[in-house]
């Protein structure tokens, strides 16, 4: 009788473990999906912010360019045109980010770094392990207990 009882307990235990593994897998998949959704939303917000900024900065850039060009022509001083150069870099960068291919170029560069330059991505003392965390926790608790 004990054998039959233990056999059914083993089956129940096995079923429970399978359920837990399946549940953990589902939880992990949901978590990864949620993280990806959050990343996509953050990227969309960044692009939207860049486009919105471009509207205001583009207006400022246009007015500044016209004003500086007019001042340079009226006063016959080409030095008035100098501020247009850095403003044009900012305008071009924001346009490229909002409507151009900057994000695709950054993505391909990041993928290239991940594939070919792995050593630059390593942590200084390697991956954090449970043992290293426990060691640091013990050392920290010793400091507090000594005081």
Swiss-Prot record:
Which is a Gene Ontology cellular component entry for this protein? mitochondrion
* Major place of residence: membrane
Could you tell me the membrane topology recorded for this protein?
Answer: Multi-pass membrane protein
GO terms of biological process kind = chemotaxis; inflammatory response; positive regulation of plasminogen activation
**Compartments in which it is found:** Cell membrane
* Side Extracellular, residues: 1-52, 100-147
Entry-linked InterPro entries: Plg-R(KT)
* This protein's UniProt keywords: Cell membrane, Chemotaxis, Inflammatory response, Membrane, Plasminogen activation, Transmembrane, Transmembrane helix
Q: How does it assemble?
A: Interacts with PLAT. Interacts with PLAUR.
What does this chain do? Receptor for plasminogen. Regulates urokinase plasminogen activator-dependent and stimulates tissue-type plasminogen activator-dependent cell surface plasminogen activation. Proposed to be part of a local catecholaminergic cell plasminogen activation system that regulates neuroendocrine prohormone processing. Involved in regulation of inflammatory response; regulates monocyte chemotactic migration and matrix metalloproteinase activation, such as of MMP2 and MMP9.
Q: Could you identify this protein by its name?
A: Plasminogen receptor (KT)
Q: Which gene encodes it?
A: Plgrkt
């Amino acid at each position: 009788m004990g054998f039959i009882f233990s056999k059914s307990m083993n089956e129940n235990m096995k079923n429970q473990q399978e359920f837990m593994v399946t549940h953990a897998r589902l939880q992990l998949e949901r978590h990864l999906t949620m993280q990806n959704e959050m990343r996509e939303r953050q990227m969309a917000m960044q692009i939207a912010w860049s486009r919105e900024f471009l509207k205001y900065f583009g207006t400022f850039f246009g007015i500044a360019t016209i004003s500086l060009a007019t001042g340079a022509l009226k006063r016959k001083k080409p030095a008035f045109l100098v501020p247009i150069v850095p403003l044009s870099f900012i305008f071009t960068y924001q346009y490229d980010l909002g409507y151009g291919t900057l994000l695709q170029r950054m993505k391909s560069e990041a993928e290239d770094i991940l594939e070919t330059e792995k050593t630059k991505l390593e942590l200084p003392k390697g991956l954090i392990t449970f043992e290293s965390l426990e060691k640091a926790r013990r050392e920290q608790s010793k400091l507090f207990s000594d005081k």
